[in-house]
Design a protein with these regions (language model features):
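Substrate-binding/catalytic subdomain of NAD(P)-dependent oxidoreductase enzymes
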Residues: 180-281, 286-288, 307
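A conserved regulatory-domain signal marking ACT and ACT-like small-molecule sensing domains
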Residues: 314, 319-395
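Rossmann-fold NAD(P)-binding glycine/threonine-rich loop
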Residues: 88-98, 105-145
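Rossmann-like NAD(P)H-binding beta-loop-alpha module
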Residues: 122-203, 210
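A short hydrophobic/small-residue beta-strand
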Residues: 101-103, 381
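Flexible, glycine/charged-enriched surface loops at secondary-structure junctions
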Residues: 38, 195-198, 219-227, 249-250, ...
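Glycine-rich phosphate/pyrophosphate-binding beta-alpha loops
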Residues: 297-299, 303-309
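N-terminal glycine-/serine-/threonine-rich beta1-alpha1-beta2 phosphate-ribose binding loop
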Residues: 1-98
Length: 395
């Protein structure tokens, strides 16, 4: 008797959705051979049925109503790739209540509604999978869930936004200014027409919240994370960084401080990174995430953190996992809270070196006066560097 195929419902046929469809179609035989489970895409929900698409899809598969996916008793698994939060929330929660496992790559959705969605998943006994939500093609989610399960996570530090990293790399390596680097990123398809979430740090912040949730066993409100973007970084900052032996990267820093009431340090901000540090060599659209565990020590995950095919790879890994667990039941919620609420320390309570650049008059006693003012606030100076006055002559 031939085994009945798993039926998939795909919501969204944008960049990632088309990558998922193309890969499932192109590598169908390979995936069935490796998973030992037959499958087919039964229905695809899109916003506009008349839109021209580069990906050729049979018209009979398309609908502009996602309810047709969730309401179809023959569809076993829902793949949510529509983006945004409100409609995605309705789709995901409706699917979970209908007993259909969900695969999503929606970081904004999980950052905002993760606690509610994970709770519903557990209550309904219906799993949700989200490998593609943080790190694109980098398998960081499953690593935190499984490979590093015996570790207390001391810290997670990394570069998890390809757009900002491309811009900073262009500024640091080629001397480009911010605006020119952004325009180039947009021309190459590495930045959206509206790049706000990438350059203001909030795309990375959404991913950081998901990683912190998995690492420390408790959901965290987005308003607890300190976020600063790269919009105000200039080529001058790179000049001074290079002179001091650093480069500049937009880093996610998640660090646990034992025996403190607000124990979790959680921030996204541009940071000086020593030019000998491995993260300093992560350039262009590549991402890297360093995870330090008490048993495993330091680990590093590196790869393309976004894009059509890398993200599709992560989505499909979850689809295969969902198919296996659906066919051979073994409940998996994606995230089960196991710790009490963990307070997040205020950015003012963190201790870390900072780089500060002053534009001052070229006269005796200026540096001494700056040192005096900083000292009144208990701030010491580790190193100073001054540049010829012509560097700052245009402000």
């Amino acid at each position: 008797m031939t085994e009945k195929p798993i039926q998939l419902g795909l919501a969204g046929l944008g960049t990632v959705g088309s990558g998922v469809y193309e890969t499932l179609y192109r590598n169908h035989s390979l995936l069935e051979a490796r998973s030992k489970i037959p499958f087919r895409i039964k229905r695809i929900a899109v916003r506009n049925l008349n839109k021209h698409r580069e990906t050729a899809v049979p018209e009979e598969l398309l609908t502009d109503d996602w309810h047709e996916l969730v309401g179809d008793p023959e569809i076993d698994i829902i793949i949510e790739l529509i983006g945004g939060t409100r409609q995605a929330y309705d789709l995901v929660t409706t699917a979970l209540r209908a007993g259909k496992p969900v695969v999503t790559g929606n970081k904004a959705l999980l950052a905002e509604y993760g606690a509610e969605i994970f709770k519903l998943s557990a209550e309904m006994g219906t799993p949700i999978y989200f490998e593609a939500s943080a790190g694109g093609g980098i398998p960081i989610i499953q690593s935190l869930q499984n490979s590093l399960i015996c570790n207390h996570i001391n810290s997670i530090v990394g570069i998890i936004n390809g757009t900002s990293n491309y811009i900073l790399s262009a500024m640091g390596e080629h001397g480009a200014d911010y605006e020119d680097a952004l325009v180039q990123a947009q021309k190459l398809g590495f930045a959206e027409e509206d790049p706000s979430l990438d350059v203001n740090g909030w795309d990375a912040a959404h991913k950081a919240l998901i990683l912190a949730t998995l690492a420390y066993g408790t959901t965290i409100s987005p308003d607890k994370i300190y976020v600063s973007g790269i919009e105000n970084i200039t080529s001058r900052d790179f000049e001074f960084a290079k002179k001091l032996g650093y480069t500049i990267k937009l880093l996610v820093v998640i660090r646990y401080h034992e025996n403190q009431e607000d124990a979790l340090e959680l921030r996204v901000q541009p940071c000086f990174v020593h030019d000998w540090h491995i993260l300093a060599s992560v350039n262009g659209v590549f991402n890297a995430i360093s995870v330090n565990g008490d048993i495993v020590g330091e680990t590093l995950f590196y790869g393309r953190g976004a894009g059509k095919n890398p993200t599709a790879s992560a989505v499909i890994s979850d689809v295969i996992t969902a198919m296996r667990e659906s066919r051979y039941p073994e409940f998996h919620t994606g995230f089960t809270p196991y710790a009490k609420s963990c307070g997040v320390m205020h950015i003012n309570d963190t201790t870390t070196p900072y780089y500060v650049r002053f534009q001052v008059a070229d006269q005796p006693g200026v540096i001494a006066e700056i040192a005096r003012i900083l000292a009144t606030f208990g701030i010491g100076i580790s190193a100073t560097s001054s540049a010829p006055s012509h560097i700052d002559e245009d402000g």
